[in-house]
């Protein structure tokens, strides 16, 4: 660390000299020598050190971190030694420019010639790093872009081009000279961005000097120069990096998308090939003769082909230029009389929409997936093929469009998230380094303190970076001495060579501006100086105080740099050090701080100069975040605080020399932080002084008193309330403007505007007086207000000069002032602000992409649009969408980004050829729309959190508006209470009721029928939020706490933006909590509390735990708890619906029952009929159930209760609901013609009504009114039954034809809603939706506010300008403005009645109409007509002219970006967020599990669901066995998959117009494949026998094979009546899913499919809900729009005449497609658009629509289906995708366990679940990664300590568990999980053989080793004895005297016997070598055999002979051991 503590200043930077280069070379040589040694070590298996990495904040092109200080001026632009230690062994040097940007260069020779010290290269480096150089290049590029955007450049621009080329050449030359060309790192071509420069220059010269024909195509490449901006601006590089990363991540999704689209395209090809060419052709007659000519309408054609290809003979669709398609199937479109359906001409849309070949089918499917103009394709296909094929489109839309497109979003979002995490990790890394540095400083500081050294006095001088060098030198010497001192224990000493690397002074620290980065994610970090705080949640607890901080937070500052060390009074001790802080010292500066304009906070009460300890001076002031807006100068609401140290105290420092010691590093850090603070300053000090002098007005006492009074008024909450009301009124006034206003109305609006302008000006003036300008302009809102006021005043001044409606638009910004008091709007604006901030670079990238493609389009296609315009435009004018000039090219690209690409692409393909257009358009679509826009959306979602949406204000206090409202409420409450008391006083003289009666009348509500205890959720409910209130005042006559009172639980009130602000000043939070806890304790202890106000009663206690009296026995009560009765007919109990947590626990039911023993009757009893209030007010409601009439009534109720609760009753009601809903579907336009059905339906309707009324009455009697009417689902039932009842009564009385009754009848369409509560799946979804409704409504409201601004602006711009004069005879085409100029001329010319003035149906004539227009623009449906009208508009009621107002397009572009893109996507954000919140509420273990635990839990979950399978036994027959071996090989499967894919390819080759030869060949190929697959099937059946049918895949194959054979045989019949039999072959593609498991590389795709599988159940529920919504709306549509005129989107097939047709229309607009076309005819109100008197089949008249009903119908449907339900679908996919990705990144996946069991089958063919210990090693080696343990693996397996059962067998669970543990690592949770798993496994496999381990692998090894040790020891012992005995015998034989047999060591026993034998046999003289090595020691076996009686070794202990064989006796070895 000593290295770290080098001083700052010049010594950090050393010039790069030849010596430096030599030093680097020396280090490189050393490293190489070390490297060879290291590689040797690694071969020996020693751990390698972690390789060093380049430091992130010292990377090239980053700014030098502040800690390194400022380089001296003379070193700027000069080569310096590299600061990053990573490059210490590489030939590099760095250069810094004035902006301290790092440039890194290679120190090798550039171009072999120029060394780093060559003057030419130095000059080039100086130029390159200079900021002016990059500015010059930037300006050149921008100028070049301007020139490129000219569509018809003048001739002189050629010379400008040469200039540009010269500048780019010069740039590249400088770079090459400075960096070198390409050989080494950091040279020119090593940077990919330079490749771009290089290619641009090469292209420029190539086009100039070589003639290459089509120059415009090559000129197009020049547009790539725009990309150079990215290489110049470093911020863009990172975003592009993120884009490239996300594109890489998209690979899997792209593969899956292409695969799915290919499958769907194949299906489309087979189903619809050639269908779209069927047209309605005029009838003709064939003329007799040989030439085949035909005649029609008296005209003769040469041949039938010529006739069929003549467009004049086709019938056109009504009101369009499209040909009417038709089909030959029964439900396809039909032709009118005089026409027949024939295959003729080309396909629709210039021939580009078709399924005639695979390529066109694929394009059609891609278009379907991106949902561009898909309704057109849908209508064309259904008209030509039949309505049944709606199913195909549903599949493609739901699987393709919703799933795949959103997967792309999910992947891009995840890539962004990962990058974000990486940024956070990088900052954490820096922080860690910083912490290490701080530890070091602390140690040094403590060391100095112990020595008694003054550690502070340095700071004054040496905090300055200009401290003299001599000081630095002296300090570094001193530090060297210090760091080798005893206190540090030598731990921090570094090798000498390190301290010599001077330039790398602060390497270990490398702290950047990361300090103040606010974009980080919040996270808790102890001792962190990096504040990870969400931008929008200011926290007051930066320095903890008791009031608003937790212990954890204050603790987190313990080691923080920014908190002063505890203060100490100097009087106690002169010696500086750490001690206790001064008593009562305030650390949190909330109450006593001021903020200056720089955001620096001074603590006013932070102690005086004497009270400051040395510690507090280590740091100068630093602010990490700017303080938020302050309301008053003296008050600083929650925000980051900061302490300003006082002047240093010099007392107590005796040693003069101490002033020059230590803390150099502290000065480094301090000055770095000081610089950081300076960088945050908003204004320089001189401005600061000026502002404080002139902008704070405190002149005289009179002024001050006026100021105080004004302040009192202005700052009062009521002033805010008044201003807010004025804003709302002003907005209302602006919204009242409309077309055709009367003069009086207009004048009123103008006066209103003047008044409001006056009010807002006055507000601003008074606020400036009250606050002084200095403080007024420190608040963002005030600045905003002042700007708007100034603009309003400007507008007043300028309005006389002309119509400046643009300035009027600025008034609209006042609406945003609402955000101040409306948190949701505020949050939303912040979200958009944050996103736009974060999106700055991304927006720039998008702009560059749009620019590039616009220029490319203009260069490539521009000319073609003008030359070949006749192909796409009948009028001869240029079409609206063309690429002739840059603006129009930009519009086309923007339109593609909006998702509309296909129509403009058709035009392009017509004029410019197919290939190039396809390439450009699809590139823009994929890059721009799918990637960049999804990245936008990902950023938007990431800055979104609904916690903020519902949170109150940031500082946790109420804002002024809420205070004002609370005051008003308090006033009203006071008035109410006073009035109440007064009335009670008057009534008090009445005699009281007897107490007994009062008590009795109160009993029934809660206690009269004792209930079973509440469910666990209620019992364990968390304490309610602080919104819960208890009324303090008691109402008279409510009894006392001693009375028998009901236990009632208040429900937590729902949150809203302006909540009931009852926590007023008089009722503080503390007392409130005391009160509630007191009441809670009363309840729990069995006491009773007074009843609350009715609205606070809990439905929980009344319903959930009700359903009658519980029995006295505790056991029964327990049973009741487990199976609680519920009212299924009414759906969910309110406990689910309303209450999240109740405040009080229920009293113990057993105690209650003891109190009232006589009521413990049957549990299945109903509740009371009436609420307690009713009983109290009407005692007659109280029935005595013990007497005769009451008893009968009670029995009746019990009977009804049993009926209603019976499951059969519920089933019957569901059946009736479905029947009645189904009956509604028959009430269509043809009902009058079908008399029988009509009569049947009438009777059925009556029957249903009676049944439902009966059900309702039964439920009333059974449940009582109280329970029935406190349940939302029951209310729904009640209302729907009422509608049926009223319509039935009206029918009976003959009022059926009355208008109101008719409209009431349409409400019967709501009947299916009753099914909601009965179907669990739908109810779950609805509950989730209901939970999200508050947030959704919030966002909807905010969207409406946003849109209001655009709508008012639209009214200002376009009101009255959308009209035009039309000539009816010319087919509704507007006349030229030269003929008719305006509305009055049109009316005056209208003599014949053929001219009339009309308006575009959707216009901006008022704000309401504007909203509808904006909805069409935002959903991109019908927006073209609106835009065209706006662009063509000239003036008020003037005839439009083609593109007269061209730049009005910009209004729509801006609206689409802010109004559509941001606001509509917020819906996804809100819904996802709500899902997550609800998950948190419901989520159990997920939230309480650590990441580690989750990992184990998931692995175990997968593991437990598997068990070993018995493999299919191999046949005994030799041939069958051979086939079996082939069939079961993986290669066989892969081969079959390959053949399937090949089969698909042959299917792709088919086209509609193929030749007979091709048809023949393909048929034969098909037969071949059918034969192959049939063969496969037969072979498998032969090999696998009856086991073949045990596998579902095999059954699937079998069915497909049978179908293929049938299809081939009966192809003609099937094709004629059904569809092409080749479709069966497509089904076979499903088998590809099977092979994905085998391919390791397909893991990503498996994850995606897994995400889909996980989503399916939820998606099914959402689909059901969507179907229900569609059903209801289609019934409404049939009732209201059946007879609407056919035009636009409504025709003979797509209409509301029948249920089926309505469903077709509604499915189409579920994705919002074509809803404008369906709405258009409904907006017709009278002639000439429709005929109000046309008679209809049901007796009504007219084919006009009803605009109000139509608009309501379509807008609500779009909001419900498109914005909510479809977004729920998206939310689920995103959620499951992240879950699936998590699963796939887990170390062990499902596949790994599958693989384990597959291998297991081979080792355990009988599925005994055990394998032999001997086989374990092979088994472990046979597995695949990550479970595999490769051989040699004996030791690893032994260490696993696996339990073994008798017979040396090991259980599969034990093995799997051990292997899993090895992969996941050790963890404390493993044991608990193991027990769980074993229990689970036992339960799943009851047949398991008794499992009692007798030993383990480790114990077995221990035993073996022990045995070996014992053997060896015994052998050695024997050997020693033998040697002794041999020695004795030898000596004896040699004739030593005195040796008798008695002296022998071994007189008897085996050794003596054998030795004596040996020696006695010898005849010759004994030599030393004659002792046979085999003769002794005796073998172990013989010893044990002979002496088994007397030796304590049992052979049975070593059960296996191998153990002994392992260790053969080796005398040599033993001899050595003795020696």
From Swiss-Prot:
The chain crosses the membrane at residues 130-149, 158-179, 189-209, 217-236, 250-272, 387-413, 720-737, 747-769, 776-796, 807-821, 839-860, 915-943, 1206-1227, 1239-1261, 1271-1293, 1300-1319, 1333-1357, 1448-1472, 1531-1549, 1561-1582, 1592-1614, 1622-1642, 1653-1681, 1748-1773. Keywords: Calmodulin-binding, Cell junction, Cell membrane, Cytoplasm, Disulfide bond, Glycoprotein, Ion channel, Ion transport, Membrane, Methylation, Phosphoprotein, Repeat, Sodium, Sodium channel, Sodium transport, Transmembrane, Transmembrane helix, Transport, Ubl conjugation, Voltage-gated channel. III repeats lie at residues 1189-1503. Residues 1903-1932 form the IQ domain. Residues 150-157, 210-216, 273-357, 379-386, 738-746, 797-806, 861-886, 906-914, 1228-1238, 1294-1299, 1358-1402, 1425-1447, 1550-1560, 1615-1621, 1682-1699, 1717-1747 are extracellular. The modification Phosphoserine is found at residues 36, 457, 460, 483-484, 497, 510, 539, 571, 664, 667, 1505. Residues 1-129, 180-188, 237-249, 414-719, 770-775, 822-838, 944-1205, 1262-1270, 1320-1332, 1473-1530, 1583-1591, 1643-1652, 1774-2019 are cytoplasmic. Disulfide bonds join 280-335, 908-917. Pore-forming subunit of Nav1.5, a voltage-gated sodium (Nav) channel that directly mediates the depolarizing phase of action potentials in excitable membranes. Navs, also called VGSCs (voltage-gated sodium channels) or VDSCs (voltage-dependent sodium channels), operate by switching between closed and open conformations depending on the voltage difference across the membrane. In the open conformation they allow Na(+) ions to selectively pass through the pore, along their electrochemical gradient. This is Sodium channel protein type 5 subunit alpha. The gene is Scn5a.
């Amino acid at each position: 660390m000593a290295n770290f503590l080098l001083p700052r200043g010049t010594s950090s930077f050393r010039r790069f000299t030849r010596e430096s280069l030599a030093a680097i070379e020396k280090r490189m040589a050393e490293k190489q020598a070390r490297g060879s040694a290291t590689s040797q070590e690694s071969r020996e298996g020693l751990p390698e050190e972690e390789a060093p990495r380049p430091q992130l904040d010292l990377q090239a092109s980053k700014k030098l971190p502040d800690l390194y200080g400022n380089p001296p001026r003379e070193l700027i632009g000069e080569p310096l030694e590299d600061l990053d230690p990573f490059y210490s062994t590489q030939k590099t040097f760095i250069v810094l420019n004035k902006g301290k940007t790092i440039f890194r260069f290679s120190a090798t020779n550039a171009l072999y010639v120029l060394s780093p010290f060559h003057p030419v290269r130095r000059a080039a480096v100086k130029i390159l790093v200079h900021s002016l150089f990059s500015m010059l290049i930037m300006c050149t590029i921008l100028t070049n872009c301007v020139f490129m955007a000219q569509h018809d450049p003048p001739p002189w621009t050629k010379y400008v081009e040469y200039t540009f080329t010269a500048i780019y050449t010069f740039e590249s030359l400088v770079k090459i000279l400075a960096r070198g060309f390409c050989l080494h790192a950091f040279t020119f071509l090593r940077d990919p961005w330079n490749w771009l420069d290089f290619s641009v220059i090469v292209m420029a010269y190539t086009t100039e000097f070589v003639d290459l024909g089509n120059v415009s195509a090559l000129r197009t490449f020049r547009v790539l120069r725009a990309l150079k901006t990215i290489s110049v601006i470093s911020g863009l590089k990172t975003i592009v990096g993120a884009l490239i990363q996300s594109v890489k991540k998209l690979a899997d999704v792209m593969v899956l998308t292409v695969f799915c689209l290919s499958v769907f395209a194949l299906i489309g090809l087979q189903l619809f090939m050639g269908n779209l060419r069927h047209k309605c052709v005029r009838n003709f007659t064939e003329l007799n003769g040989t030439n085949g000519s035909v005649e029609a309408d008296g005209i003769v054609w040469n041949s039938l082909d010529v006739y069929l290809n003549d467009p004049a003979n086709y019938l056109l669709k009504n009101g369009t230029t499209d040909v009417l398609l038709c089909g030959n199937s029964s439900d396809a479109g039909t032709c009118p009389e005089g026409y027949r359906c024939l295959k003729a001409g080309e396909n629709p849309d210039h021939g580009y929409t078709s399924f005639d070949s695979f390529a066109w089918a694929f394009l059609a499917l891609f278009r379907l997936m991106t949902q561009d103009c898909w309704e057109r394709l849908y209508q064309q296909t259904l008209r030509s093929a039949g309505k049944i094929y709606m199913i195909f489109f549903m599949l493609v839309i739901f699987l393709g469009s919703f799933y795949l497109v959103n997967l792309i979003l999910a992947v891009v979002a995840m890539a962004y998230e990962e990058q974000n995490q990486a940024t956070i990790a990088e900052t954490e890394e820096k922080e860690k380094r910083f912490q290490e540095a701080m530890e070091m400083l602390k140690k040094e500081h403590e060391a100095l303190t112990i020595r008694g050294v003054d550690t502070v006095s340095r700071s004054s001088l040496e905090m300055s970076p200009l401290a003299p060098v001599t000081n630095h030198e002296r300090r570094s010497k001193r530090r060297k001495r210090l760091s080798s001192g005893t206190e540090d224990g030598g731990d921090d000493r570094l090798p000498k060579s390190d301290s010599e690397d001077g330039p790398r002074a602060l390497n270990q620290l490398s702290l950047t501006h990361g300090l103040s980065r606010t974009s980080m994610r919040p996270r808790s970090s102890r001792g962190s100086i990096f504040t990870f705080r969400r931008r929008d949640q200011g926290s007051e607890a930066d320095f903890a105080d008791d009031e608003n901080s937790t212990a954890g937070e204050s603790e987190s500052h313990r080691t923080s740099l920014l908190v002063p060390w505890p203060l100490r009074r100097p009087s106690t001790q002169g010696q500086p050090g750490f001690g206790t802080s001064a008593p009562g010292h305030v650390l949190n500066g909330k109450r006593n701080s001021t903020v200056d304009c720089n955001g620096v906070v001074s603590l006013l009460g932070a102690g005086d100069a004497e009270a400051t300890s040395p510690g507090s001076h280590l740091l100068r002031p630093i602010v990490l975040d700017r303080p938020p807006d302050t309301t008053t100068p003296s008050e600083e609401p929650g925000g980051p605080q900061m302490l300003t140290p006082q002047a240093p105290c010099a007392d107590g420092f005796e040693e003069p020399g101490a002033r020059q010691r230590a803390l150099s590093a502290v000065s480094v850090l301090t000055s770095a932080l000081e610089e950081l603070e300076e960088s945050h300053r908003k204004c320089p000090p001189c401005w600061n002084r000026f502002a404080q002098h002139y902008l704070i007005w405190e002149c005289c006492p009179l002024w001050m008193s006026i100021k105080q009074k004004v302040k009192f008024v202005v700052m009062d909450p009521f002033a805010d309330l008044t201003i807010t009301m004025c804003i709302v009124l002003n907005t209302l006034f602006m919204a009242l403007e409309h077309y055709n206003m009367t003069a009086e109305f207009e004048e009123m609006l103008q006066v209103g505007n003047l008044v409001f302008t006056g009010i807002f000006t006055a507000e601003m003036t008074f606020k400036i007086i009250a606050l002084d300008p200095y403080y007024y302009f420190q608040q963002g809102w005030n600045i905003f207000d002042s700007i708007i006021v100034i603009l309003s005043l400007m507008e007043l001044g300028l309005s006389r000069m002309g119509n400046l409606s643009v300035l009027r638009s600025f008034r609209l910004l006042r609406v945003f002032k609402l955000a101040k008091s409306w948190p949701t709007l505020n949050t939303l604006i912040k979200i958009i602000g944050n996103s736009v901030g974060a999106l700055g670079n991304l927006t720039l990238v998008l702009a560059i992409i749009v620019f590039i493609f616009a220029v490319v389009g203009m260069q490539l296609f521009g000319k073609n649009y003008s030359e070949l315009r006749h192909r796409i435009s009948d009028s001869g004018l240029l079409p609206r969408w063309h690429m002739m000039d840059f603006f129009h090219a930009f519009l086309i690209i923007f339109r593609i980004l909006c998702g509309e690409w296909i129509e403009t692409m058709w035009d392009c393909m017509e004029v410019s050829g197919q290939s190039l257009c396809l390439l450009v358009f699809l590139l823009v679509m994929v890059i721009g729309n799918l990637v960049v826009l999804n990245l936008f959306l990902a950023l938007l979602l990431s800055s979104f959190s609904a916690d903020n949406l519902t949170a109150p204000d940031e500082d946790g206090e109420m804002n002024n508006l809420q205070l004002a409202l609370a005051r008003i409420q308090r006033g009203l409450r006071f008035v109410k209470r006073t009035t109440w008391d007064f009335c009670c006083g008057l009534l008090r003289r009445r005699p009281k009721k007897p107490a007994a009666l009062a008590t009795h009348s109160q009993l029934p509500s809660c206690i009269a029928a004792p209930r079973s205890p509440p469910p666990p959720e209620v019992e364990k409910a968390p304490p309610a939020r602080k919104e819960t209130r208890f009324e303090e005042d008691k109402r008279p006559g409510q009894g006392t706490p001693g009375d028998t009172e009901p236990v009632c639980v208040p429900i937590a009130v729902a949150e809203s933006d302006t909540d009931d602000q009852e926590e007023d000043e008089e009722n503080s939070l503390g007392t409130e909590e005391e009160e509630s806890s007191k009441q809670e304790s009363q309840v729990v202890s069995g006491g009773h509390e007074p009843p609350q106000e009715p609205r606070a009663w809990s439905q929980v206690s009344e319903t959930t735990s009700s359903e009658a009296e519980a029995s006295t026995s505790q056991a029964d009560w327990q049973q009741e708890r487990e199976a609680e009765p519920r009212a299924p007919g009414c759906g969910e109990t309110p406990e689910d619906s309303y209450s999240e947590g109740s405040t009080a626990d229920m009293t113990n039911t057993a105690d209650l029952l003891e109190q009232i023993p006589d009521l413990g009757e049957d549990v299945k009893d109903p509740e009371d009929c009436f609420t307690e209030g009713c009983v109290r007010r009407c005692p007659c409601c109280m029935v005595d159930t013990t007497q005769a009439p009451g008893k009968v009534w009670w029995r009746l109720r019990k009977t009804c209760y049993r009926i209603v609760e019976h499951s059969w009753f519920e089933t019957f009601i569901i059946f009736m609901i479905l029947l009645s809903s189904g009956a509604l579907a028959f009430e269509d336009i043809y009902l009058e013609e079908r008399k029988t059905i009509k009569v049947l339906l009438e009777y059925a309707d009556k029957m249903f009504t009676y049944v439902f009324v009966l059900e309702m009455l039964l439920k009333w009697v059974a449940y009582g009114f109280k329970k029935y009417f406190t349940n939302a689902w029951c209310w729904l039932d009640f209302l729907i039954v009422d509608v049926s009842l009223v319509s039935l009564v009206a029918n009976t009385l003959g009022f059926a034809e009355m208008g109101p009754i008719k409209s009431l009848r349409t409400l019967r369409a709501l009947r299916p809603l009753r099914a909601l509560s009965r179907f669990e799946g739908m109810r779950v979804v609805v509950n989730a939706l209901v939970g999200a409704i508050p947030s959704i409504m919030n966002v909807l409201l905010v969207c409406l506010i946003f849109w209001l601004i655009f709508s008012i602006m639209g009214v200002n711009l376009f009101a009255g300008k959308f009209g035009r004069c039309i000539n009816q005879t010319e087919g509704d085409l507007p006349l030229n403005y030269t003929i008719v100029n305006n509305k009055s001329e049109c009316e005056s010319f209208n003599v014949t009645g053929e001219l009339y003035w009309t308006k575009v149906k959707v216009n901006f004539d008022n704000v309401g109409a504007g909203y509808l227009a904006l909805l069409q623009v935002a959903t991109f449906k019908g927006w073209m007509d609106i835009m065209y009208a706006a662009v063509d508009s000239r003036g008020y009621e003037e005839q439009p002219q083609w593109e007269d107002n061209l730049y009005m397009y910009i209004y729509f572009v801006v609206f689409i970006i802010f109004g559509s893109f941001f606001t509509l996507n917020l819906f996804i954000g809100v819904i996802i967020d709500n899902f997550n919140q609800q998950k948190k509420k419901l989520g159990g273990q997920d939230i309480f599990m650590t990441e580690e635990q989750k990992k184990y839990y998931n692995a175990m979950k997968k593991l437990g669901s598997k068990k070993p399978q018995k493999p299919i036994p191999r046949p005994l027959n030799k041939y069958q066995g051979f086939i079996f071996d082939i069939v079961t090989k993986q290669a066989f499967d892969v081969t079959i998959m390959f053949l399937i894919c090949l089969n698909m390819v042959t299917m792709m080759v088919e086209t509609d117009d193929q030749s007979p030869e091709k048809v023949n060949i393909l048929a034969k190929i098909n037969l071949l494949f059918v034969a192959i697959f049939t063969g496969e099937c037969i072979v498998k059946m032969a090999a696998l026998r009856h086991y073949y049918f045990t596998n579902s895949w095999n059954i699937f194959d079998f069915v497909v094979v049978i179908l293929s054979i049938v299809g081939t045989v009966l192809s003609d019949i099937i094709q004629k009546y059904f569809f092409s039999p080749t479709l069966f072959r497509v089904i076979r593609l499903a088998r590809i899913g099977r092979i994905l498991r085998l391919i390791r590389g397909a893991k990503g795709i498996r994850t995606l499919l897994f995400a889909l599988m996980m989503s399916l159940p939820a998606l099914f529920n959402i689909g059901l809900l969507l179907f229900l919504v569609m059903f209801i709306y289609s019934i409404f549509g049939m009732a209201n729009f059946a007879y609407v005129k056919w035009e636009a989107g409504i025709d003979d097939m797509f209409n509301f005449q029948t249920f089926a047709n309505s469903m077709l229309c509604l499915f189409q607009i579920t994705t919002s497609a074509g809803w404008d076309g369906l709405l258009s005819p409904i907006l017709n109100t009278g002639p000439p658009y429709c005929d109000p008197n046309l008679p209809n089949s049901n007796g009504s008249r007219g084919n006009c629509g009803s605009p109000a009903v139509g608009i309501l119908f379509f807008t609500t449907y779009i909001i419900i289906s498109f914005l909510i339900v479809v977004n729920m679908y998206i939310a689920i996919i995103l959620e499951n995708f992240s879950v699936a990705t998590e699963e796939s990144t887990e170390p062990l996946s499902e596949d790994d366990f599958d693989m384990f069991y597959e291998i297991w089958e081979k080792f355990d063919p009988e599925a005994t679940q055990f394998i032999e210990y001997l086989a374990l090693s092979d088994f472990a080696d046979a597995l695949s990664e990550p479970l595999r343990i490769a051989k040699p693996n004996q030791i690893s397996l032994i260490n696993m300590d696996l339990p073994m059962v008798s017979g040396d067998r090991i259980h599969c669970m034990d093995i799997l568990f051990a292997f899993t543990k090895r992969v996941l690592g050790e963890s404390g949770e493993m044991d608990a999980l193991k027990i769980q798993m074993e229990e689970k496994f036992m339960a799943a496999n009851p047949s398991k053989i008794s499992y009692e381990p007798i030993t383990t692998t480790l114990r077995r090894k221990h035993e073996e080793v022990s045995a070996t040790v014992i053997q060896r020891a015994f052998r050695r012992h024997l050997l020693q004895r033998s040697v002794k005995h041999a020695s004795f015998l030898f000596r004896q034989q040699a004739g030593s005297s005195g040796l008798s047999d008695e002296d022998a060591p071994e007189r008897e026993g085996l050794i003596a016997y054998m030795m004596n034998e040996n020696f006695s046999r010898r005849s010759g003289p004994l030599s030393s070598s004659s002792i046979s090595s085999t003769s002794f020691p005796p073998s172990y076996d013989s010893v044990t055999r002979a002496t088994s009686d007397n030796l304590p070794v049992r052979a049975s202990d070593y059960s296996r002979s191998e153990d002994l064989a392992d260790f053969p006796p080796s005398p040599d070895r033993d001899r050595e051991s003795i020696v």
